[in-house]
Amino acid sequence: MERIRGLEEYVKNKEYREALGLPKEKMENYELLAQGEYNINYAFTHPVTGKKLLLRVNCGSQMHLQHQIEYEAHALKLIEGSGRTPKVLYVDGSKKILDHGVLVMEYLPGHAMDYHTELMLAAPCLAYIHSVTIPESEEILIHPDNPLKAILEECEEMFKVYLESPLGDEEKKTYIRELLNLGWKRKAEIRLESGYQCCINTELNSTNFLINGEGKSNYLIDWEKPLFGNPAQDLGHFLAPTTTFWKTDVILTSEEIEKFIDAYIKAVGNRFKADMIREHTHAFIPITCLRGITWCAMAWVQYQQPDKLIFNESTFKKLNAYLDMDFLKNIRGYLEP
């Protein structure tokens, strides 16, 4: 816990301990569980209930939000009824005692999804989550009017970091610019019909799923970038090569993609109208690829900074792989007609 200045003192404060029903004196032990690019997670066992819990410390916001941890907690509360996401137990984004937002949630069982053997288990998991009705009065979740345009604008912001950096490769700057131009051209040719909207995750990497097996509860964690939007945006992200290749070396075949969409539509059943899901998913996949590439370009520059709080060696290696010209040329194939 020494990595986060003040965290050891934070978990001893009265408000935190009373809210979670912890003894006045700290008895629990916090162990580093995992870290992403914007959060560090610690696991601990509640000394009174014996339940395993997760302490999440927020270190940044992809969405440039002032209240990132509250936003994530709000989304989790909205979809708690799905039974496929962690229950929020405590949230503090005040930053009065600690310079970071803090979230405590239940610890869920399971292992990271294996694309080769467990791909289809993600379909009913997503269907459960997407089927949760969001109240009409909901105003906190961000709701882009034009999701494809919103993704491309985000891509432009991220690419700008690489483009303006003297560390960036000039050939790659030119090539990524060409890919973005293809993305804008493709977006102009696509008209997504408005339809069912729900809370979507937008970050469906294999490690964000906790798999327990067929006939058991499988979960989706890591809700730092949720939106109110088209469920096909989640499918497009989940199936895109820039997603599957991230933590593995898997790129799904066209047949695997179609089978997954079939399984998802079947899992949805009559809970909401899913007749346009396939068409919309294929509209999101190539644009999602651009998001993956431009995020890697931005992150590559950030990883050159000596004061970066979170540094993942495996991530740095993947950043270089995604910016390899052969990989970029492969992505071009998804953007060209």
Locations of regions flagged by a protein language model:
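ATP/Mg2+ or Mg2+-diphosphate-binding catalytic cores
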Residues: 292-337
